[in-house]
Amino acid sequence: MKYLAAYLLLTVGGKDSPSASDIESVLSTVGIEAESERIETLINELNGKDIDELIAAGNEKLATVPTGGAASAAPAAAAGGAAPAAEEAAKEEAKEEEESDEDMGFGLFD
């Protein structure tokens, strides 16, 4: 993930096709020792591909992934009068989960 993040930073910064040394340079600025084999694999996989198209395709794939929230909402709706209270509780629970999962237990460049 850290190699991909460095690659994306370089492309956003204006490099159309970042080299292995460019990626190593970005990673070294935050104290990460880069593995050249992984960098070469990343570059080979992304060579000649449009980053924006890859991101769009990834978003489409993520949109098809089912989430756990839909299953808990169905029984609440069937309960009739309890639905508004259940919706509020679900919103509060979702808000708490968002706050607790901000870094999801790992850093971007760890």
UniProtKB/Swiss-Prot annotation:
GO terms for cellular component: cytosol; cytosolic large ribosomal subunit; RNA polymerase I complex. The modification Phosphoserine is found at S100. Residues 95-104 have a biased composition (Acidic residues). Gene3D superfamilies: 1.10.10.1410. Residues 76-87 have a biased composition (Low complexity). It is found in: Cytoplasm. One of its GO terms (molecular function) is structural constituent of ribosome. Keywords: Cytoplasm, Phosphoprotein, Ribonucleoprotein, Ribosomal protein. Residues 76-110 are annotated as: Disordered. Yeasts contain 4 individual small ribosomal A proteins (RPA) which can be classified into two couples of similar but not identical sequences. Each couple is distinctly related to one of the two A proteins present in multicellular organisms. Rpa3 and rpa4 are essential for cell survival, whereas rpa1 and rpa2 are not. Component of the large ribosomal subunit (LSU). Mature yeast ribosomes consist of a small (40S) and a large (60S) subunit. The 40S small subunit contains 1 molecule of ribosomal RNA (18S rRNA) and at least 33 different proteins. The large 60S subunit contains 3 rRNA molecules (25S, 5.8S and 5S rRNA) and at least 46 different proteins. The acidic ribosomal P-proteins form the stalk structure of the 60S subunit. They are organized as a pentameric complex in which uL10/P0 interacts with 2 heterodimers of P1 and P2 proteins. Belongs to the eukaryotic ribosomal protein P1/P2 family. This is Large ribosomal subunit protein P2A. It comes from Schizosaccharomyces pombe (strain 972 / ATCC 24843) (Fission yeast). The lineage of its organism: Eukaryota, Fungi, Dikarya, Ascomycota, Taphrinomycotina.
